[in-house]
UniProtKB/Swiss-Prot annotation:
Pfam families: Ribosomal_S7 (PF00177)
Oligomer status and interactors: Part of the 30S ribosomal subunit. Contacts proteins S9 and S11.
Protein name stated in the entry: Small ribosomal subunit protein uS7
Domain of life: Bacteria
The organism of origin for this protein: Desulfotalea psychrophila (strain LSv54 / DSM 12343)
An annotated GO cellular component: small ribosomal subunit
GO biological process: translation
Upper classification of the organism: Bacteria, Pseudomonadati, Thermodesulfobacteriota, Desulfobulbia, Desulfobulbales
Function summary: One of the primary rRNA binding proteins, it binds directly to 16S rRNA where it nucleates assembly of the head domain of the 30S subunit. Is located at the subunit interface close to the decoding center, probably blocks exit of the E-site tRNA.
InterPro entries assigned to the protein according to its UniProt record, in alphabetical order: Ribosomal_uS7 (IPR000235), Ribosomal_uS7_bac/org-type (IPR005717), Ribosomal_uS7_CS (IPR020606), Ribosomal_uS7_dom (IPR023798), Ribosomal_uS7_dom_sf (IPR036823)
GO MF annotation terms: rRNA binding; structural constituent of ribosome; tRNA binding
């Protein structure tokens, strides 16, 4: 048995505008070089653009539904068995689902062509909300890989 103490997770304080922990985690993922106020401004500008373009929807619900549509349920992990490496499908815990969805939305928003980051982020969130976009495609590819390797699910540990 390990003698190390389990580290308590630090609570994430909700963001000031939407009072949401998910938004706070997203802005933390968006932040570069410790510039949190800039990351928050980019996110809030993106949500204002979402509110302008989708008048019938609340921007926070659009963001939350987009996150839900990007979150993967299963992924494959490499496992060595007798000299061969198998891609074993595994279920993902909730915290990792959120982290992957945040990472994918931000990275594919950055790789989009556009003027500023808030516009790129807004269009990526709206595409994810409508089940389009690169982040949703990445989730589908991850699920397809897990489905293709379902035969190796008994190697799960």
């Amino acid at each position: 048995m390990s003698r190390r103490k389990t580290i308590e997770k630090r609570p994430v304080t909700p963001d000031p505008r939407f009072n949401s922990v998910l938004v706070a985690k997203f802005t933390n993922g968006l932040m570069e070089r410790g510039k949190k106020s800039l990351a928050q401004r980019i996110f809030y500008d993106a949500m204002d653009l979402v509110a302008d373009r989708m008048k019938d929807e609340e921007p926070l619900t659009v963001f939350e539904e987009a996150m839900e549509k990007v979150r993967p349920r299963v992924e494959v992990k490499s496992r060595r068995v007798g000299g061969a490496t198998y891609q074993v499908p595994m279920e993902i815990r909730q915290a990792r689902r959120n982290a992957l969805a945040i990472r994918w939305i931000i990275s594919y928003a950055k790789s989009r062509s556009g003027k500023c980051m808030s516009e790129k982020l807004a269009s990526e969130v709206m595409d994810a909300f409508n089940n389009r976009g690169a982040a949703v495609k990445k989730r589908d590819d991850t699920h397809r890989m897990a489905e293709a390797n379902k035969a190796f699910a008994h190697y799960r540990w």
